[in-house]
Amino acid sequence: MGIKQHNGNTKADRLAELKIRSPSIQLIKFGAIGLNAIIFSPLLIAADTGSQYGTNITINDGDRITGDTADPSGNLYGVMTPAGNTPGNINLGNDVTVNVNDASGYAKGIIIQGKNSSLTANRLTVDVVGQTSAIGINLIGDYTHADLGTGSTIKSNDDGIIIGHSSTLTATQFTIENSNGIGLTINDYGTSVDLGSGSKITTDGSTGVYIGGLNGNNANGAARFTATDLTIDVQGYSAMGINVQKNSVVDLGTNSTIKTNGDNAHGLWSFGQVSANALTVDVTGAAANGVEVRGGTTTIGADSHISSAQGGGLVTSGSDAIINFTGTAAQRNSIFSGGSYGASAQTATAVVNMQNTDITVDRNGSLALGLWALSGGRITGDSLAITGAAGARGIYAMTNSQIDLTSDLVIDMSTPDQMAIATQHDDGYAASRINASGRMLINGSVLSKGGLINLDMHPGSVWTGSSLSDNVNGGKLDVAMNNSVWNVTSNSNLDTLALSHSTVDFASHGSTAGTFATLNVENLSGNSTFIMRADVVGEGNGVNNKGDLLNISGSSAGNHVLAIRNQGSEATTGNEVLTVVKTTDGAASFSASSQVELGGYLYDVRKNGTNWELYASGTVPEPTPNPEPTPAPAQPPIVNPDPTPEPAPTPKPTTTADAGGNYLNVGYLLNYVENRTLMQRMGDLRNQSKDGNIWLRSYGGSLDSFASGKLSGFDMGYSGIQFGGDKRLSDVMPLYVGLYIGSTHASPDYSGGDGTARSDYMGMYASYMAQNGFYSDLVIKASRQKNSFHVLDSQNNGVNANGTANGMSISLEAGQRFNLSPTGYGFYIEPQTQLTYSHQNEMTMKASNGLNIHLNHYESLLGRASMILGYDITAGNSQLNVYVKTGAIREFSGDTEYLLNNSREKYSFKGNGWNNGVGVSAQYNKQHTFYLEADYTQGNLFDQKQVNGGYRFSF
């Protein structure tokens, strides 16, 4: 086989050795196989051999080399070439195994010492264990080349592979497993290792890959390490995944993974040039950073993910240290940090550039920073998303550093009170700078402490949090918003606020009740909407009242809208005034987006001097005082009559208060509708010869209630039905006593909405019909009314309320018919009078907007005096009565009041009216009576149109 061995054995000697070591030799003795088959058929040989030494070594496929020879230092080795300029040529074929176990010294697997040597193998396995140290493969000779093919494995209890002196090594699907030492060490200029695809390096106690072009001839170029789909998994204190020193170039291809587990065990530590795509780095030890660059440029492409359980994600710290961490919109990168920061630039020329990256920091409540620039470091970001848990800060710059952000920016802190963007002042340093421009979604506060912060918020931006600018060290906070929203969560101040079609909302965030915010702005410009809240009541009647406040200390410009939130639960009186905007120049213009409902009254915004204030609609502003004029010489007094005082303006109720207060009118009018005349209830009872009646009537119409007091008018359609029966008590006395029940349904339309009302009632009556034309009618009624309404407030929010009240009434009616014909038939006149007393209980409603509406009870005494002109025709057992009527009505009582959150408003039903009507009552066969009436009432407080019809059966 032409094998040159360290012990100089011949072929015969080799066979003798095989006789001992190989079971194949036993087959020769029995003639099973020939000698030529053993010599010339290597597929049948899996030989064990000892240490191999020389310049030309060839090992058969599948052979096993066991280190049994020591080098001059007394250390066992497996394969070794001599040192010097004589190149070695080592061919280890396929599936060869090299085992070295030095129980007392330094175990060496394969040592290539000759210059320009070569090592070839495929599916090679090297397994070395040494007492003091071990090395799997050591390529010492200058310009040595090793090709380890596919699927080779190096196992060592110390170092895996050391290569230097501008040598090269290639392999694919390569495995290094070792403890204590470094998995792969690449030294010197020009040294190159290419591990192809699918290789794996596992170490326990030290670094996975070390590369440093620090020695040798720099003309040979940088040291290089190349791999793709590489896995590095290391354990131990300061055990780095890859340690890249100066003059080194590392290309990790695509889908490589680095895992470390140990304190200070960084994933990638670099002073050189590193590139990777779809890189995963996962480090779990204390103070272990994912990627730390101390020099050179590290470029990490799309779909890369860095996770550090207790350290930083990315950090640059050193001269011209640069990290480019570049994801794409389709394949975003990510950083997770459970330690100090997500990404950090920590020295004057250190830079971190990121694109399309999601950053999460969570240190279990302790301080952590999403982006951290310090000591002159610079961070740039394009389309970043930062999520900060409790205790974290989103973006932080200090000690003359700079952060520049563009495109979409998301900063989501766990609460709006946490710092989303902040600078820190440090004595002796220039102000740090943070610039952001793009569409922003920020949940957190922005604080300029001795720094310069500029936010240019593009359309669709939303910021929820507060702001602070302390103006130390020339620091400023300038914000420009275009079609964006700022939800102000607490007292804030900034230097410049330039708004274009944007909203500043003091009210959207769920702050503590009664807690308001003041926004101090030095310079305001543009056009915007400010959404605000107000407690105009304060300690009562406006004393020490408060609300959200916009305070402009410098220049103001533009046209702005104030949208002040309605608050129905406010116990207002309509006399309060509250300043909501303060300016020094009064140059900007502010107007209300709508009237404001506070309690039961409407408020508006007006300018007073250079400020704007909230006041109850209808009140007159206090005049701005003029300077006292220079006194003129005394003149004789001229006495003028006092001018006629103008009516004092009154506050206007809200739509909710109006609908609630108007239920006084609804209840009053329902009573009016239900308590009608005897003719309307039962038709003409004269010439009645029967003992009893059963009757049914229905009615319907419309009412228009006029504005009165502070209540606006409304109209109401209604319909109802009554059913009753009576019995004549005696043949000699025409007195009928009966019972009835009824129900009325109404649909009031208010100025701000509509509602429903229902009255269910029952009662009894006694009617007396004398032969001389006199009659009287007594009616007693008890009722229960239910009311509900739905209105839109001044800001188009729906408001609902409902309530129930009981009432009773007593009505006494009397009249006398005078026939104008001696026959007793034909034309007649009939004067009538009626007096109705009603009592309505109090009622309380709480509207859905918080307004409490209390309607006091009231008494009503309604009088009516009417005249009927009719024509009566009798034919056999039938009778027809046609009539017209007219009369006056008057409310003698009806004083009441209603309370809007305990603010009293008086109301009265007193007034006069005129009632006119036409009707017919037809009796057939002295049993069946049909009656119909239409009438119209015109009064001071309401108008009514009604049609009434019924049927009576007499028995």
From Swiss-Prot:
Region (Disordered): 616-659
Entries under Gene3D superfamilies matching the protein: 2.160.20.20, Autotransporter beta-domain
SUPFAM superfamilies with a match to the protein in the record: Autotransporter, Pectin lyase-like
Pfam families to which the protein is assigned, alphabetical: Autotransporter (PF03797), Pertactin (PF03212)
Single GO cellular component term: outer membrane
Biased composition (Pro residues): 622-652
UniProt keyword annotation of Methyltransferase present: no
Knockout or disruption consequences: No change in cell adhesion or biofilm formation.
GO biological process, one term: cell adhesion involved in biofilm formation
Keywords of this entry: Cell adhesion
Domain Autotransporter residues, every copy: 687-955
PANTHER family: ANTIGEN 43-RELATED, AUTOTRANSPORTER
Main function: Upon overexpression shows increased adherence to polyvinyl chloride (PVC) plates, increased mature biofilm formation.
Designated name of the protein: Probable autotransporter YcgV
Gene: ycgV
